């Protein structure tokens, strides 16, 4: 719980007013209480009482976080976790060494480089002692990357007055066998710094792509099944670790508001196998659109990038060892005593201790001491054992957080309690030494990094490619753990048909996930303008035939004014995210379909029916 000074000042003012009243009734105490030059000892006493009563009053008015935290940790634990720093990693394959596709798997650990590099020098200076070797910032690659023996050479806009055309020219490594070149592994990222261009390209790729052809060696290869599939909505595209009991629609909404760049990816699909006789050193992918590209769009060679993937500042770590003592209510979780500012806790994964036991070995005839691992169960889980209230023996661990008074973020503690919240007896703890496995971040250190600082790896990396971060790491975002916001979030999780009848209800749900708006006043104003642009939400039941079977679902029409958005493409991306999220409101064996209407131009975009995910019971 974060200490709020207003409670202290209100209580101190109340005590001073009472002092004046008391001095009026008892004049012999006036020189201690009512006079301006009061006794300093009395003044310190009043301030101390005001501090204690202010804390007590704040605790009474804190909206029962002990209850809401437990519910949210079970229903949606990521809301009480910080959103770590995120960035984009680009690989550059060595064309002289790459002849076949090479996979860079997700979960690859990337760091700020070798000792003495510029990135690590910044971190050592940040730690306060340039002679200390600060631990590097560690990022985890969130998606697979396929490296192919091709490079993107040129992107050209060849639109006509009636149709849009984009030519993407690729250079091929010498000696490449076209028979083994699977171009369906190509993934594009809209990497232009111009938000207008990248959002408009997103709209054109999703809505107006009409066809494509491959041109190489003077011949054109038609591709009737070609499509560009938007990336970021499937479970394998997740950036944040996501529990299995929580629907991915919440993840999509949270990641969109925290890092929209992770959704600007497209997979090339439907490219046929190339003829074996091709021996070209380049080829061109021509994309045809049903309408010309906007006149003010600016296509450059970096408007499309290959071999990119988002990375997140998350890694496995162990906390300092804890010795259990039955007289303590909780224990501080410290990832590192030497570099406390370099680590922050994202989640507690497991709690394990070593227990000793004696047994008599038959061949020796004497007791032998053995050690076994004891895995402590989590309190906020669905694995509680049935016990009588007077004979409780199972001890659970509980991760507790409160807003830190000394730095941004939280202070973390670990408590060992019974199922009813009571403290266990000393015999159940046995002064054991506990090892706590964590998932950690580097707190705010990645903000000090610049593009090109992340170039190292903790394990084996493909020798055929180098890599670097091409965007500056974002600032981590901590959740709000006090106040009425949690009750609003729990209300939003109570999904039902009535939630789709009111635009204000949808705005409240969206606001709960927009963590940038919570921390930054400027982003809050921009977010509020976009929420105000949602004018109407109309939802009606509809019937559709799926494989000849009639199915009833929900159809929602969202009317949005385009003024606060960069362009129509940004509106379309928001609609794509909401299409995945709103499928939560349709029950199993049902569906939901979304239509977004631009209230200024009356243009509309419709998304395909999405199967419902809300259980009936």
Which residues are covered by each model-predicted region?
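Residues at beta-strand starts and edge strands
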Residues: 83-87, 162-166, 182-184, 208, ...
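Short, low-complexity Pro/Thr/Gly
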Residues: 175-394
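Extracellular ectodomain segments of secreted/surface proteins
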Residues: 41, 53-60, 78, 152-163, ...
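Short, Φ-rich (hydrophobic/aromatic) sequence segments
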Residues: 41, 45-49, 71, 205, ...
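Short linear motifs embedded in intrinsically disordered, proline/glycine-rich low-complexity segments
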Residues: 52-59, 70-79, 84-100, 114-115, ...
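C-terminal domain/tail detector
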Residues: 28, 361-617
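Extended assembly-interface regions of large multimeric machines
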Residues: 1-220
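Mixed-charge (acidic/basic) macromolecular-recognition segments
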Residues: 1-24, 33-36, 227-232, 236-276, ...
